[in-house]
Amino acid sequence: MDTHIYDAIVVGGGLAGLTSGLLLAEKNQKVLVLEAEDQVGGRTSSWNDHGMHVESGFHRYIGYYSQLPKILRKADVELNEMLTWEEKIHVRVGQERPVVMGLAPLFGFVKMIKGLIGNHKYLSLKDKLSLIPFFVGGLLQYLFHPKKLDQIDVRSFAKKCGVTDRAFRYLIIPLSTGIYFLPPTEYSAYVFFGLFAPGVMKFYKLRLGAFNGGMTEVMCEPIARKIRELGGEVKTGVRVHQLQVQDGKVTGVETEAGDRYSCEKAAILATTLHNVKDLALPFKDEPFFANTIYKLPMMPASVIQIELDKPAIEIDITSFAPLTHLASLAEQSRTTFQESEGRLSIILTPPEKFLELDGKETLEIVLKDLDRVGIPIRDHVLDYRKIDHVDDFHSLRPGNQHLRPQQKTPIKSLYLAGDYTHQPYFATMEGAAASGIRAVDAYFKDHH
């Protein structure tokens, strides 16, 4: 049983953990990052699954991010090399051509204007105008009455604001279920507006970025590499079993293999909420933990990735298919999976339904829905993988956001990082990076 001594140990090699590790290593702290899986990245990872290159779920980088870009610059990652920018989205309804919505006011101004004044077949002037009180009222409540807004779901708030059924179907469902895969009747209005509120002052930067490769390869491994270059350590395939606690202080961690790693200053738990609940059991009766993480519910996600003999869609673009099981989808053979002839990645809704189904059953449902929205791929499927995340997300249903804990805990030398912790963002890459930054800020305030 080996013992290794560090200034700080970070449990979890996702974006929150890598952010924490990089900022600590940058300040000459002897830091160790431990990741349970065989690759870094956590919910933003990619790997080879028995011969098929897959990722944890299909992700998009939002152009108004500000915290994550700082970390990527420190890791020498060039944003425009990592991403292919999208200035519009597709909403697929039936067999007809997709509804095109421009979303980049600076980089795709003409496309955005066409989307706003066009699409009359689907959205009348009345439909579009009905969205104004919804967005204005929602953003104002987000700023001034957040707890009240977190008590109502998106569907109920839209009805209250007079959003028409067509506007709700073609715009609100894609922007809610399409992003966080919950039905609008179960989706907190506070979370919905919280996705957009941080970008209001940076609205001109709005656009989406598709990754030009697996997220481990193009984003997360470069951060891990920079940590190592700065003298830190990053170990994969190491699952932490429990915290070592002495006199109320966290002094290290023990792995499932029986190895012990000691920390002289602190441990940062940057793993999933589910894992944090297991690791923090020695402190479960402390009010800080009892009233936050042990009350904060979790929710699942389910994704299917389909390998094809040709592209399913003519361009790689973020698409939504409201009123189907396809929360959001994208062809990725020209961006993330360039070694593939065709690759369709789909986030499924409701995820609970698909956790109970095997891959074959899931594929059949998906193929039928794809036929409904004009993407017939049944004769072109080569392989597929269904990837489930049972408890990886904190619940975005109404009434839960006040339960998110601060990064600094009352336990000496223990900090939390993860997008479930309290910061301005939710289940996003930006939230993960922001939480890591806040955890390290708290660390240095205590160890200056």
Residue ranges, per PLM feature:
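Active-site/ligand-binding neighborhood in enzyme catalytic cores
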Residues: 133-243
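Conserved flavin/dinucleotide-binding core of flavoenzymes
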Residues: 323-448
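N-terminal Rossmann-like FAD-binding beta1-loop-alpha1 element of flavoenzymes
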Residues: 4-33
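Mid-domain catalytic core of redox enzymes
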Residues: 3, 238-360, 364, 368-373
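Conserved Rossmann-like nucleotide-cofactor binding loop
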Residues: 16, 39, 274
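Glycine-rich FAD pyrophosphate-binding loop
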Residues: 25-49
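Short, well-ordered coil/turn residues at beta-beta hairpins
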Residues: 64, 178, 269-271
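Dinucleotide-binding Rossmann-like beta1-alpha1 core, especially the glycine-rich loop
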Residues: 50-135, 143-144
